[in-house]
Amino acid sequence: MSCLDVMYQVYGPPQPYFAAAYTPYHQKLAYYSKMQEAQECASPGSSASGSSSFSNPTPASVKEEEGSPEKERPPEAEYINSRCVLFTYFQGDISSVVDEHFSRALSHPSSYTPSCTSSKAHRSSGPWRAEGTFPMSQRSFPASFWNSAYQAPVPAPLGSPLAAAHSELPFATDPYSPATLHGHLHQGAADWHHAHPHHAHPHHPYALGGALGAQASAYPRPAVHEVYAPHFDPRYGPLLMPAATGRPGRLAPASAPAPGSPPCELAAKGEPAGSAWAAPGGPFVSPTGDVAQSLGLSVDSGKRRRECSLPSAPPALYPTLG
């Protein structure tokens, strides 16, 4: 019994492709095994006749193997594990053949031309070109986009004929100029603009009453820099209230008291401290217009009243125990 017969008896029948590959070798091994069994089982008397009868096929098979040694050479078997045996049918050096194959394949120039390049060239040569194929120099960018030191021209007044002729342009000035980009942030507040909601104006976005009626429709809508201008005005603080340095210029100078008058003359007249601020002709319409200023006045008037209520007589002497 041969090694192949033992292996396939243990691990079951071979696969179809293995069976097709090993069929001639199985037949040859079975033929030689039958010959050996027949020679051993033959009697000594008939050994001569048996040897003469079996002498003819043996030389024929030997000649056949000598005539085609490469075709009939069995594959090389390599044991990998208990369930895998590798058979190699290739004859020769595998590494040299692989190197020769790849060197031959790499030596030939590539004749592959992708269809995407041809279609792209055809599309670019046509009358319609894609937007991405235009270079940056052919696009309609203003001069300040290419030159950072470009100075934007001064816009003409609204009443001039030059401004009327170019009024249909989308931009009155260059949108990329530094003066245009930073002009809105540093522009001061208008004279008519106030941060308080009770100062209604047609241009104010929060104006009430008639500002939202026919009068507002006659004026253009306020720009962004007009709405947010008080944020960047140095006269206003972080809470949109005028700073302390800007108030004395708006208020009327107070009259200096007489030398002989007491310091509480304002409170002695019976006139409240906040009435001068809330008067119709005063600088503010109501005390709520400026919360910080009214609080400061109330604190000052309280201090003056306390000073007037204190007795001016000398302190009383405490009685001493005799």
Swiss-Prot record:
Region described as Disordered: 42-75, 248-322
Tissues expressing this chain: Skeletal muscle specific.
Residue pairs linked by disulfide bridges in the UniProt entry: none
GO MF assignments: transcription coactivator activity
Endpoints of the signal sequence: none
InterPro entries per the UniProt record, alphabetical: Vg_fam
Alphabetized UniProt keyword annotations: Nucleus, Transcription, Transcription regulation
Domain of life: Eukaryota
Biased composition (Pro residues): 312-322
Biological-process GO terms, alphabetical: positive regulation of transcription by RNA polymerase II; skeletal muscle tissue development
Primary localisation category: nucleus
Composition-biased stretches (Basic and acidic residues): 62-75
Biased composition (Low complexity): 42-61, 248-258, 270-283
Location in the cell: Nucleus
Its biological purpose: May act as a specific coactivator for the mammalian TEFs. May play a role in the development of skeletal muscles.
PANTHER family: TRANSCRIPTION COFACTOR VESTIGIAL-LIKE PROTEIN (PTHR15950), TRANSCRIPTION COFACTOR VESTIGIAL-LIKE PROTEIN 2 (PTHR15950:SF17)
Similarity-based family: Belongs to the vestigial family.
Name recorded for this polypeptide: Transcription cofactor vestigial-like protein 2
Species annotation: Mus musculus (Mouse)
Lineage, uppermost ranks: Eukaryota, Metazoa, Chordata, Craniata, Vertebrata
